[in-house]
Amino acid sequence: MNARWLLIPTAATLFGCASVQPTQARRDVGEIVERRVGLPDVVPEQQDAESRARVRARVAALMAEPLTVERALQVAMLNNRELRATLEDLGVAQAELVQAGLLENPTISGDLVNSTRGNGLGGGLALSQSLLSAFLIPAKRNLARSRLAHAVVTVGQATLVLARDVRVAFVHAQAAEQALGLHRGRAQAAEVAHELAQRQFDAGNITPLDQQLFAAALDRARVELADAQLAMTVAREDLTRLLGLWGEDVAWTFAAPLDSALPPETELGNLEQQGMRDRLDLSAARFETQSIEYALTLRRRGMIPQLNVGISARNEVGDDIGHEWVLGPSLSLELPIFDPGHADIARIQAFLRQAQHRLQDMAIHVRSEIRVHRTQLVAARRKVEYYERTVLPRAESITELTLQQYNAMLVGTYQLLETRTDQIDSRREYVEALRDYWVARSELELAVGGRIPAREHGRAASH
């Protein structure tokens, strides 16, 4: 009997001391971010007040300087509230793992009876424990471990998605800011042309139609400038939200314009294999399938009838015995007559087949996404290089030749302004091509689940 009473505190010691803090899980996510995004020490292992204060201090230090894409990524990883909420999934999964290793609490019951013959009060006490709960602990822990692994890769995927979103928003905001400057130059050229046309019209040198055409060109330039201002504001706010900023911090500035130095040519031949190996959402789907398999095993073991054993003590009363305490073992057994569990197992089996089909479908989509983004990256790079080699030099040459002819009085001011406007448009299109390249690269990096491998020998354009 003493051994039975000692069983409960011993089990509490063995199963109740595991930590509910997801320190290791957060460390695993931090390693994912460091290896795949290139940012060390941006996932705090603790969530106490001191840790939060350190995070706020780091964000303030980062925002004290103009933003680079690396600095923006650090701020987002530390300060994005949606990511911080997602990180709490690790705490939920860790707590479930600890819970899975615990025995069910013992049950104590009792009754009190009164003798109808005036012999006094009697009753009893019983303490029981489920043996099935102890038998199921290994299966429960396997299921909980799989769910914790699923949570780690799911949160890791969320960090990669956030990194992609920040990079894309960053280059969109950079491009919008540069486009606004180019639109200002275009509007200034249109204003000069309109003023010149107005003076010539007042002097009677051009027709009313020509004067109205120049006025309409100025109207278009002003409308496009207003659209560019709106686009820049929206792009900045998109990035600001991802960085989790508000108040005075929203007045950030860029450290440099959109990067025109493309990285070396990348090796794109084995990206599908890399994606199938490294995609975290694909790993999450695998862990989801594994979790359902463990759940099925757990449910099958749970078909064993519930068995509770314990110890019972009663105070018996009667005419011939007076008051007497009796002590002995107790046992209760569930009778699975109405619900043997077959329907529940069929439901889990259907979930398992569903998860397997979705895993296969995701694998197909992953390969297709990689091929699409790889094609987009190659096309975007070719477009940027064509602008650098051909379009921009030709636009500059045309402007220089037109200026020479203008100085020689072979062409007029209108043609010079028109040439200058065309050059501005070419430059704006080049900025858009650069933006599309960096967006395509960010999308491909997310599609393969990490960084794109670089060739040993490549070209890096610089301006």
Task: Identify the residue ranges that each predicted region occupies.
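Terminal intrinsically disordered/low-complexity segments used for targeting and assembly
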Residues: 1-75, 229-274, 445-463
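Short segments within alpha-helical structural elements
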Residues: 220-247, 358, 394-450
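Intrinsically disordered, glycine/charged-rich N-terminal periplasmic/extracytoplasmic linker segments
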Residues: 58-109, 154
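Amphipathic alpha-helical coiled-coil segments and their boundaries
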Residues: 69-72, 79, 86, 130, ...
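Periplasmic alpha-helical coiled-coil/stalk elements that build and connect Gram-negative outer-membrane
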Residues: 137, 146, 153-274, 373-376, ...
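Amphipathic alpha-helical coiled-coil scaffold segments and their short linker/junction regions
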Residues: 72-73, 77-79, 143, 206, ...
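Small/polar-residue-enriched beta-strand and adjacent coil segments characteristic
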Residues: 87, 93-97, 103-158, 267-274, ...
